Amino acid sequence: MSTLILLHSALGRTSGMDAVAERFALAGHAVHTPDVYAGKTFDAAEPGVAHAQEVGFSTLVDRVKDACEDLGDDLVFGGFSLGAALAQQMGKNDPRARGVLLFHGGGFPKPTRWQAGVPVQAHFAVDDSWRTPGTIETLMESAAKAGTQAEYFLYPGDSHLFSDPTTPDYREDSAELLYERALAFLDRF
């Protein structure tokens, strides 16, 4: 089974994140959930995003690197919203990356370098106001041009964190399909 590094959203490492991690662990995966906010959590996205901006993206990436330092090779990076941006960064640059799962975030505004042999799977609600049209397609094209599998899925509605069972955005039908697809992705490793 996979070693999954699961990175939280701008809300921080909440009970919802722990529930999601448990779901992957019950499927047999070794799941690590680094707290890149050092214990801070938020009830809404805006203050969480403000905190991330105050800390700085490069510092958050460094915290992920530090948390993964002793985990060995063959890591799958997954993340939710802000955590998807961190997972994407690790998948793009960490030589131990074997796969990337992006939930409710990710993408690039222009073509970029992607590691060969690091497949990526992304999940968004079609009318999510946090999704910038075209950026996920650019990431998929960049990964495919690197010779790796790249796929993304769109779900009905406008909910952002629709797979987090503790948020008002939660949509059980879409979340179940997302987890089914993500678990099938993890079974490849």
Spell out what each predicted region is.
Residues A122-F124:
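Short beta-strand/loop motif that positions the catalytic acidic residue
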Residues G79-G83, A87:
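Gly/Ala-rich beta-loop-alpha elbow adjacent to hydrolase catalytic centers
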